[in-house]
Amino acid sequence: MTATIGHFLQNLCGEYSNQKQAFENPPLFAHIFLRYKPIEHLQPGSILLEQTYAVDPKHPYRLRVIRAEELTSGIIKLWNHTFKEPDRFSSATFDQDCREKIREEDLILLDHCHYQVRQLDDGFHGELEPGCRCIVRRDGKETYLVSSFHLQGDELSTLDRGHDPQTHDRCWGSIAGKFHFQRISHWAENIPETWL
C-alpha cells in the first residue's frame, strides 16, 4: 500500500449521515447512512460499503466491496464489487463474525463501474471512470450511471444519477443536487497497519 492510499482510507473509513440535509428538506432528500468499514482479511485496501435508509437501518439497499489501488502517482482506482448473495452479509458492517466470513468468491466485479480518485488541495475527488458504460437497471430500464464524490475532513458529498443510453436524459437520481453527509463515527482504527 502507498502513503496516498493509506491517507485516503484513513479519511474515508467511518459512518456518515445526511440527517441535517434530510430534516431541512425532506421532500427532496431521504435520510441515509453511508458506512465504510475495512475488511482486514481480504486484499489490502478492501472496504465494505453499506448504504441504508434511516427508516430501515438493518436492510442495506446497497452493499459493495471497494478495493483501493494506486495506478499512477496520486491517482487511486476504486475497484467496485457487488455480492452474489448480499442478504448473507447484510449485517456485516456491525457484526465482525459475519464480516470475517466474506470471501473473494462471494464477490462479483462490476465491469466499468470503478472510480478514479485524486487528492487535491480541498480533499479527495472521485468520479466514475469515463465512457458511460456502468449499466444500472432501474424500474425495468437500462441506464448508465454518472457518479462522483468529494471527501474533505468529516464531510462527504455524493451525486449519483442514471441516464438514458440513447438520449442521455436523466432517468433517476437527485434533482436537487448533491447529498451532503457528515461523519458521525470514525473507523480508521480498524485499518490494519500493514495497509498504511
From Swiss-Prot:
Gene Ontology molecular function terms on file? lyase activity
Q: Does the keyword Magnesium apply?
A: no
Report whether DNA repair shows up as a keyword of the record: no
Q: Which EC number(s) are documented for this chain?
A: 4.-.-.-
Q: What class of enzyme is it?
A: lyase
Q: Which UniProt keywords apply?
A: Lyase
Domain of life of the organism encoding this protein: Bacteria
HAMAP family attached to this UniProt entry: Chrphore_lyase_CpxT
What is stated as this protein's family in its record? Belongs to the CpcT/CpeT biliprotein lyase family.
Record's function text: Covalently attaches a chromophore to Cys residue(s) of phycobiliproteins.
Q: Which PANTHER family match?
A: CHROMOPHORE LYASE CRL, CHLOROPLASTIC
Name assigned to this protein = Chromophore lyase CpcT/CpeT
Its source organism is Synechococcus sp. (strain WH8020)
